[in-house]
């Protein structure tokens, strides 16, 4: 899901055929396929920008809780703590943490769009068109059409990792049902292979 899905998607693309010995299939939920477009969406006026600022603040708070581990290091913590957006936080902290020159290099490396053709196991992605991290117009639909291994199921609504159903959504969510059906379809009758 979300960032974990970005990591898994990149792993699947990077290791291509070699993954077949380790995984039979994968499902990605609410993945930001294009980190540049996702960031652009989060910087739009209104709720997206509010969410962006809130999440940047959460990231800052998590660093403040362990700041003693970062003092006298490569970071200008006051500059990091003044970040108002996720992109600013990434530029000031994440890039330095992982050795990227800037957010553009980091986002180019992180995006899955442009790498789907390298994935060699069945993958189902579930995304909502109203996901502020991965809006419908940023989904790699054309690239997916050319892949024998990758499919994207989109819903009009669901937000980011939402997919709730009903007036009081206390039962399984839509994403739970899709995962269950997908897993059953992949593994039914194939357990002897494990």
Language-model region placement:
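Short helix/loop capping segments that flank catalytic or ligand/cofactor-binding pockets
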Residues: 36-37, 134-135, 162-163
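Hydrophobic/aromatic beta-strand patches that form the interior of the parallel beta-sheet core
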Residues: 27-29, 124-126, 153
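Active-site nucleophile elbow and catalytic-triad environment of alpha/beta-hydrolase enzymes
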Residues: 92-115
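Short, conserved loop/helix-junction motifs that constitute active-site signature segments
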Residues: 20-21, 116-120, 143-147
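Catalytic active-site module of serine/aspartate enzymes centered on a nucleophile-bearing elbow/loop
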Residues: 156-194
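Alpha/beta-hydrolase-fold enzymes
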Residues: 1-97
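Short beta-strand/loop motif that positions the catalytic acidic residue
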Residues: 119, 125-127, 131
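Conserved loop-alpha-helix segment in the C-terminal half of the alpha/beta-hydrolase fold
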Residues: 129, 133-150
């Amino acid at each position: 899901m979300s960032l974990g899905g970005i990591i898994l998607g990149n792993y699947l693309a990077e290791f291509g055929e070699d993954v077949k010995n380790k995984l039979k299939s994968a499902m990605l939920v609410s993945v930001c396929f294009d980190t540049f477009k996702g960031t652009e969406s989060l910087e739009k006026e209104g709720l997206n920008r509010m969410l962006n600022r809130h999440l940047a603040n959460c990231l800052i708070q998590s660093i403040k809780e362990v700041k003693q581990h970062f003092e006298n290091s490569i970071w200008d913590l006051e500059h990091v703590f003044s970040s108002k957006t996720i992109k600013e936080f990434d530029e000031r902290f994440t890039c330095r943490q992982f050795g990227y020159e800037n957010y553009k290099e980091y986002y180019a490396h992180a995006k899955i769009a442009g790498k789907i053709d390298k994935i060699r196991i069945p993958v189902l992605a579930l995304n909502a068109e109203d996901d502020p991290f991965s809006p419908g117009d940023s989904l790699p639909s054309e690239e997916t059409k050319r892949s024998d291994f990758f499919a994207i199921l989109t819903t009009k609504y669901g937000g980011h990792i939402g997919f709730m159903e009903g007036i009081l959504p206390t039962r399984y969510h839509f994403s739970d049902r899709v995962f269950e059906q997908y897993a059953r379809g992949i593994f039914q009758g194939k357990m002897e292979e494990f």
